[in-house]
């Protein structure tokens, strides 16, 4: 549930900004949610292409399949961008002011200049697109810069936060209960980060074993 809003006087209480690791944990959860949503849409499209290309005359089917395949590829790229954009814009402009990942990790998104006010739908769209654009134009370096700024700057603002004048804060910031804010990692964030770390380690070990097995089979 969304934390209650506060009177103007209480909104002037100290604010706890969400640090790097809480944001990373929330991002992991949100990535899982949006990835599943994308697959649920894209996979049926792939089956449609396969169905079309295996019907009728092989020559015309291949031609139609090639054209449709290109169309599906373009549509898939659009879906991969549109799903998370709409997801974040809808959730973070709602009364919760947070995506599902942020809700789970006890943080929310607010306007930097409005004492905890909501970030509008289109500003959320711009914020996500700014994040993706910065990441693409810098060949991924923007992600590292965003992580550094989210962890080290005074108000924990990443570049896309500065562009859109937003803050990521504890869910109890700018409410009637500012004393409930937490500066450390919450339980959900710790569990998510721990599981993610274990998965990464196991992935590295699995790849190492596969490479070793391939090397042994060739020798």
Enumerate the predicted regions with their spans.
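Juxtamembrane cytosolic face of transmembrane helices
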Residues: 14-25, 31, 87-103, 118, ...
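Membrane-helix interface segments in multi-pass membrane proteins
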Residues: 38-81, 189-219
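Cytosolic-side membrane-entry/anchor segment at the start of a transmembrane helix
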Residues: 14-53, 77-97, 212-216
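A structural micro-motif at secondary-structure boundaries
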Residues: 111-124
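Lipid-exposed faces of alpha-helical membrane segments in multi-pass integral membrane proteins
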Residues: 29, 33, 37, 41, ...
